[in-house]
C-alpha cells in the first residue's frame, strides 16, 4: 500500500463501496493515517429504517488553527458493468487515466487529501504548523450518495460533542467543470422538493358535465409557476429555478376522467429565500393562479439543504493562490451546481469545495487523468503550507 495519491485511489476504487456498503474503503485509509500519527476513530451511525453507515474521523495535533479535509468513500452503482471498457472496480490505469467508480466522485479527491497531508507531515517532523501547534483532521463518510442521514451530519455532531472545533474545511468534491483549477465552490443553492395536487371529480368521459377534469387545471398551474421567475439572482447566486420532474394521474383507463392530478417539482433557490419564505411564495402563486376554480394543495418534502455562502476573504484567497500556483489559472469563486455535504459543514466552520474535474462522474467509464491526481495533491499540499505558514 503506497502513500501517493494514485496508489491510495486505486486501493479505494477496488473496494466496491456502493452506498451503504463500506466494502473495506475506510480500512484503506485507517492504517495510513494511524501510521502518520493521526488519532483515528471509526464510528457507525444508525437510524431506524435505514442502513447503518461506517464513518471515519482522524486528527493529528491538538491546537489551533485546525483545518479539516472532508469527503466520502461511498459511490453510486456502476450501472451496466458490461458497458465499461475497464472493470468498474478494477482501478486500472490505461493511457494515463485511472478508471473506476469513484475515480472522480470522490475517492480520487480523498486520496489526494490524504497523500497531501502525509507529505506535509513528513516534511514538518510529523506535526502540523511551524511550531507543531496546529491540527489537521479528516471527516470521511460512507453516506453521501444516498439519503445522507448517517454520515457527515452525524459525524460533525459526534465531533462537536467531543469538543472538536474546526477553523476551516476543504471538501474534496469534484468542483471543476472543464479543467483542474477553473472553479472553487464557496456556497450552494438550497434545495426544496414538493408535490402539487389538484383535486377534480372522477367520471365517465361521455358525461364530462358530471365530472371535473384536473388535468387542464394542473397544466395551467404548471404553466403559471414556470412562466414567471422566482427572482433575478443575487451578487453571488444565479436565479432560483423551479423544475417539474413528473406529472401523474394514476389512471390506466381511457374512458375515465381522473379524480386527481399531481405534479412533482424541485426548486434550487438562492439567498433571496429560506425554506419558509420560498414555500409561502410558491403557495401564493398557486392560489393566485387557481382562484376558486379548483382545490389545490402542496405537500412539501423535508429538506436539510439550505442555501449558504462562505464569504470571500483570506481563506478563499489562500486556496485560490494554491490552485493558481499549481494550475496557472485563477479559479472562479462559484455557487453553482447541486447540493453536497458542505451544507452540513457550514454550520461548524467556513467551508469551500475544491477537487477534481467532474466531467465523467456517475458515468460509465468514470476516470481521472493521473496528472490531475498529482496536481490536486500539490494544490492540497500548497493549502497546508500556506495555512500553517
UniProtKB/Swiss-Prot annotation:
Q: Which cofactor does it need?
A: Zn(2+); Co(2+)
Q: Which keywords does this Swiss-Prot/TrEMBL entry list?
A: Amino-acid biosynthesis, Cobalt, Diaminopimelate biosynthesis, Hydrolase, Lysine biosynthesis, Metal-binding, Zinc
What are the EC numbers?
3.5.1.18
Query: What detail does the entry give on cofactor binding?
Result: Binds 2 Zn(2+) or Co(2+) ions per subunit.
GO MF, one example? succinyl-diaminopimelate desuccinylase activity
The biological pathway it contributes to is: Amino-acid biosynthesis; L-lysine biosynthesis via DAP pathway; LL-2,6-diaminopimelate from (S)-tetrahydrodipicolinate (succinylase route): step 3/3
Class of the enzyme per the UniProt entry, highest EC level: hydrolase
InterPro entries per record: ArgE/DapE_CS (IPR001261), Bact_exopeptidase_dim_dom (IPR036264), DapE_proteobac (IPR005941), Peptidase_M20 (IPR002933), Peptidase_M20_dimer (IPR011650), Peptidase_M20A (IPR050072)
A GO BP entry is: L-arginine biosynthetic process
Q: Which domain of life is it from?
A: Bacteria
Instruction: List residues binding Zn(2+) 2.
Output: 105, 145, 362
Q: Identify the catalytic residues.
A: 74, 144 (proton acceptor)
> Catalyses which reaction?
N-succinyl-(2S,6S)-2,6-diaminopimelate + H2O = (2S,6S)-2,6-diaminopimelate + succinate
Binding residues annotated for Zn(2+) 1, in chain numbering: 72, 105, 173
What biological function has been recorded for the protein in this entry? Catalyzes the hydrolysis of N-succinyl-L,L-diaminopimelic acid (SDAP), forming succinate and LL-2,6-diaminopimelate (DAP), an intermediate involved in the bacterial biosynthesis of lysine and meso-diaminopimelic acid, an essential component of bacterial cell walls.
Q: How does it assemble?
A: Homodimer.
> Which HAMAP family does the record cross-reference, listed alphabetically?
DapE
The UniProt entry's sequence similarity note says: Belongs to the peptidase M20A family. DapE subfamily.
Give the protein's recorded name: Succinyl-diaminopimelate desuccinylase
What species was this sequence derived from?
Nitrobacter winogradskyi (strain ATCC 25391 / DSM 10237 / CIP 104748 / NCIMB 11846 / Nb-255)
- Kindly list the organism's lineage: Bacteria, Pseudomonadati, Pseudomonadota, Alphaproteobacteria, Hyphomicrobiales
Q: Which gene encodes it?
A: dapE
